[in-house]
A protein has these predicted regions:
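Acidic catalytic/metal-coordinating carboxylates
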Residues: 49, 75-78
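Non-catalytic signal-transmission and effector/linker regions of two-component phosphorelay proteins
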Residues: 1-20, 119-132
Length: 132
C-alpha cells in the first residue's frame, strides 16, 4: 500500500470535503476508499498508520477522521489525542473502528465507535450525520 492513496471522486461537490481514513489492513482500507469514492460526494484520503496521518494533516485539513483502533506505532485513540493537541482539530468529528473498542475511552472523548464488522449502510449514514 502506498503511504498516501487518493481515489478520484465521481461526485461533484463544492467545496470538496475531505475524509482522512487511517487503516493498516490493505483490504479494508481499499474497500473503505472505494466505498467512500463511489457512494459519497467526499474526497477520501487513505493512510495506513498514525504517523502518516499526522503528516497528511499538514497538507490537508480533513472534515472527518475515520481511524482503526489497532494501528502500528500508536492506536487510534492515541492518534486522536495527538491530533487534538498538536493541530487545530477540536471540532473535527472522528469515527473509531475496531472489533474491540475500549468503550470508556471512546465515551470520554465523545468519539463515534463502529464495531467491526459493520454494515456499509450504517457506516455511510454515520458519515453523513457527522460531516454535514
Amino acid at each position: 500500500m502506498q503511504s498516501l492513496q487518493q481515489q478520484p471522486n465521481t461526485h461533484n461537490s463544492s467545496p470538496e470535503k475531505i475524509i482522512l481514513v487511517v487503516e493498516d489492513d490493505d483490504s479494508i482500507g481499499s474497500m473503505l476508499l472505494e466505498t467512500l469514492s463511489q457512494e459519497t460526494p467526499y474526497k477520501p484520503v487513505l493512510v495506513n498508520d498514525g504517523f502518516q496521518a499526522l503528516q497528511a494533516v499538514r497538507s490537508t485539513k480533513p472534515d472527518l477522521f475515520i481511524t482503526d483502533y489497532r494501528l502500528p506505532n500508536m492506536n487510534g485513540i492515541e492518534l486522536y489525542d495527538r491530533l487534538r493537541r498538536t493541530h487545530d482539530f477540536d471540532d473535527t468529528p472522528a469515527i473509531i473502528m475496531s472489533a474491540y473498542l475500549p468503550e470508556d475511552e471512546v465515551r470520554k472523548r465523545r468519539l463515534i465507535g463502529l464495531s467491526k464488522p459493520f454494515e456499509i449502510d450504517e457506516f455511510l449514514e454515520t458519515i453523513e450525520k457527522l460531516i454535514q
